Amino acid sequence: MQTAGKLRKREYQAILGAIIAGAIILAVKPEVLLEGIQRSSLYAVIALPMALILGIVGIINLAHGDFMMLGSYLAYWFAVKSGLDPLLAIIPAMLAFFLIGILTFYSIIKPVLGSPELNQLLLTFGLGLVLEEAANLSFTSAPLKLSVPYVSASLTIGELTFGTFEFVYVLAAILVFYIISLFLKNTRIGRAARAVGQNPKGAKLVGIDINKTYLIIFSLSIAIVGAIGVIFAMRHSVFPVMGAPYTMKSFCLIAMAGIGNITGILWYSALLGVSESIITAIPGAAGWADLVFFALIVGTILIRSYQQRVK
């Protein structure tokens, strides 16, 4: 796993692209740049836990966004039943989802470790469908919306008006990135996890308990994405299939950044989030935002493949 440190060549390309896009819209519509930063942070904070699982456990978790969806439903249930601010559900959500991660690992993930990748993909895809259907049966497919007055607050500076709650995503992305980086660099379990991610057989030979490491990393990642679901529910509608698009975008960001490169995820999130904001700011073009997102990903992968062939 690459943490905060030296940048790769591909990251410089992403940074350059984000800077160019940011400079253009800053000169024309600065509020679009702020929206792009907020959108980028949301993508990054969702993708980082998925990258941790893929980089160390080696599993592509196609149910990733569905765990976030469950976290959002937990926030809704907590707020409705208690009458308290749903933000207070973050710590209970992390604890609950850490336990859910343990249960999921032992019952579903561990039995397929070392199996063909297609089997793992089908299993996590099926798990996502089960979680979506469980949410549908429990809450119906109708979108649910929390009423939290302060999430719609805005700030005006001169002629620039922008929402303030979305900067929670920025703070969350920075916090999650540095927590993961410090955990991997400065803790015994984190260093063991990096060793397992780089060479599982070698790590086992030096006495590292691989299954225990997988368990901790998987459960920690599920706890993080469950807490993100709580924050997400405060601003967005909650419904059973809300997490699926974020699973795909997270996986695509990981593919662009490279497996194990959590620093690159931040930069590519910035590039894609800002690009999406530019598209949505164009009258009548909002529906093209996802198309542009995936077109940029395809273009990046094609260019990288061409560069590798040339070398």
Where are these regions (language model features)?
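Membrane-interfacial amphipathic/re-entrant helices at transmembrane-helix boundaries
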Residues: M1-A47, L74, D85-A89, S115-Q120, ...
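Inter-helical junctions in multi-pass inner-membrane proteins, predominant
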Residues: A27-R39, I180-L184, Y214-A257, S277-L291
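Helix-loop-helix "hairpin" substructures at the membrane interface of multi-pass membrane proteins
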Residues: T161-V238, I265-W267
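Hydrophobic alpha-helical segments within and immediately flanking transmembrane helices
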Residues: L42-M50, A63-K81, P92, I100, ...
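Cytosolic-side transmembrane-helix boundaries in multi-pass membrane proteins
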Residues: M1-G22, S138, Q198-K212, I279, ...
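Single transmembrane alpha-helix segments in multi-pass membrane proteins
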Residues: P30-A79, T104-S115, N119, A257-I262, ...
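Alpha-helical transmembrane segments within multi-pass membrane transporters and channels
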Residues: G83-L127, A134, W267-L272
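Transmembrane helix-bundle core of multi-pass membrane transporters
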Residues: V112-N186, T213-I216, A281, A285, ...
